[in-house]
Amino acid sequence: MDSFHVMQWLIHSIDMFLRNLQKEYKARDESTRCEIFSKYGHQHRINISDEVYLLKKYRWLLLANQEHLEYHLEPRYDRHFRFFINTFGYEEKFLALHPYIKDFRDLKEEYVRFNSRNAGNPLKAAEEIDYLIHKYCSSEHHIFVQFGNLLRKYKNPIINSFIMVDRLGPDGIYNSRLSNGPIESLNRKVKDLKRLGRGFRNFEHMRNRFLFATRRNPIY
């Protein structure tokens, strides 16, 4: 369990919460449409609600790391709202969609900061992770209770993922955190080769194809 997969689990869980919330608002809007139909006896087009619009187009305000968000100060015209609005305005409206959303962002960002500042310092990460586990497991939000249990279960692998190692890339040696990404990438190449070849009956032939496809120095 490395840094990427920990964050992937958390972002996926929050995203599922937002998608379910969007379904609830869509169901509410459909109920309103049906009420209008039963009252007036004809179909009536209802514009997409503010809540569904924000959840469809601006989930990234919660899912993206805050340090990566680009806020534009100059208001831009929004055709749905029919007025000028900037990123801060969208953020304010998005956070007001549900009482949990601001808490989710604060709790997520706390782990993001922990993950960033301890790169290359596994001893410090080991000291801080216990506090996070306790905080998340004591949370009133089920998503973060589960997240705390995940951190507890994979505590040692997560701490080890803060170790920095030298890697060889196209531009030479660079420093990077321990990750199972490289081996997953290699496994994916094997699967792609098998899929493109529609299977192989001869292992030696497949092995040679794989070694040739993953060679570092091209043959001219």
In which residue ranges do the predicted regions lie?
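Inter-helix linker motif
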Residues: M1-H12
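Acidic/histidine-rich catalytic cores and adjacent linkers
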Residues: M7, A27-Y220
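Short, surface-exposed amphipathic charged segments that create phosphate/polyanion-binding patches used
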Residues: I11-K23
